[in-house]
């Protein structure tokens, strides 16, 4: 049986691949795929406006190829983990 951290990492990878490739490359998220992922998988996602999601996409897309690859997605998750840590620590 997998340890909780193994399961969590597997889930993060699975969520990326659940949304990636619906519109093209199966290893990247388009702007609309990222928007759907954020809105469906994060509590805060439903509260974000389109302009905020577009800004997030621009910030995440480090190489400016108009998609978010897995490395850019992991960077996003790291930033989210830092925010969650700050909230949980008070």
Swiss-Prot record:
Extract the InterPro entries matched here: EF-hand-dom_pair (IPR011992), EF_Hand_1_Ca_BS (IPR018247), EF_hand_dom (IPR002048), S-100A6 (IPR034118), S100/CaBP7/8-like_CS (IPR001751), S100_Ca-bd_sub (IPR013787)
**Entry GO CC:** cytoplasm; cytoplasmic side of plasma membrane; cytosol; nuclear envelope; nucleus; perinuclear region of cytoplasm
The record ties this protein, via CDD domains, to:
S-100A6
Give GO terms for biological process.
cellular response to virus
* In-chain residues carrying the UniProt-annotated modification N6-acetyllysine: 40, 47
Tell me the residue numbers annotated for binding Ca(2+) 2. Answer: 61, 63, 65, 72
> Whom does it interact with, and what assembly results?
Homodimer; head to tail assembly of 2 subunits. Interacts with CACYBP in a calcium-dependent manner. Interacts with ANXA2 and ANXA11 (via N-terminus). Interacts with SUGT1. Interacts with TP53; has higher affinity for TP53 that is phosphorylated on its N-terminal domain, and lower affinity for TP53 that is phosphorylated on its C-terminal domain. Interacts with tropomyosin. Interacts with FKBP4. Interacts with PPP5C (via TPR repeats); the interaction is calcium-dependent and modulates PPP5C activity. Interacts with TPPP; this interaction inhibits TPPP dimerization.
Q: Which PANTHER family match?
A: PROTEIN S100-A6, S100 CALCIUM-BINDING PROTEIN
The name under which this protein is listed is Protein S100-A6
């Amino acid at each position: 049986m997998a340890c909780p951290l193994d399961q969590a990492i597997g889930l993060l990878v699975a969520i990326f691949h659940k949304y990636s490739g619906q519109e093209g490359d199966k290893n990247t998220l388009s702007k609309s795929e990222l928007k759907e992922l954020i809105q469906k998988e994060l509590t805060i996602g439903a509260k974000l406006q389109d302009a905020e999601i577009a800004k997030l996409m621009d910030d995440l897309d480090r190489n400016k190829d108009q998609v978010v690859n897995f490395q850019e997605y992991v960077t996003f998750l790291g930033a989210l983990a830092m925010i969650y840590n700050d909230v949980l620590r008070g």
